[in-house]
């Protein structure tokens, strides 16, 4: 079952925690690639100095953040790595959640090929398939083409995991500072990174 539009509404920190344990799905050339979300970061611009929309900054890149919740915000870092975010909060309130890491589930062979251009990989390489925002986008084939796409689409969405299959019973949710935002002054210390403690696919312990 796809997460309905209402799933993405409300407080961004709560939406971030709700995303943990759900499945991010991208259909590429008719093949389903997916992973269970195990690490996220919340960004609450315009008051969050770590957010692209801090101060109400509105550009061609950030325009989608000002739109309806439940859409994809994809951007490039270092000119080469894509990052996938879920837009939250009401229209005009530019907030979102960065998906930082996944546990791969569907389309494993395609994911391996996307990451390493081969399917015969080591255990260490397997652990590195989707344990970072750029890695998971490459693995799932998410690019700037997906910026602004509704997460109600057939090809890109969040799939709700049934309670009896949800991994929240196996891992404790831990909160801590976000990663690689040294420029963000006091926002560096906000505990807005949420992850499953001890999960092997978390990007940073």
Curated annotation (Swiss-Prot):
Coiled coil segments of this chain: none
Covalent S-S links between cysteines: none
Gene3D superfamilies named in the record: Methylpurine-DNA glycosylase (MPG)
Keywords annotated in UniProt: DNA damage, DNA repair, Hydrolase
One GO molecular-function entry: alkylbase DNA N-glycosylase activity
Gene Ontology BP terms: base-excision repair
Pfam families listed in its UniProt record: Pur_DNA_glyco (PF02245)
Keyword field contains rRNA-binding: no
Enzyme Commission designation: 3.2.2.-
InterPro entries in UniProt: Formyl_transferase-like_C_sf (IPR011034), MPG (IPR003180), MPG_sf (IPR036995)
Taxonomic superkingdom: Bacteria
NCBIfam families: 3mg, PRK00802.1-1, PRK00802.1-3
Recorded family membership: Belongs to the DNA glycosylase MPG family.
Name this protein carries in UniProt: Putative 3-methyladenine DNA glycosylase
Organism: Bacillus cereus (strain ATCC 10987 / NRS 248)
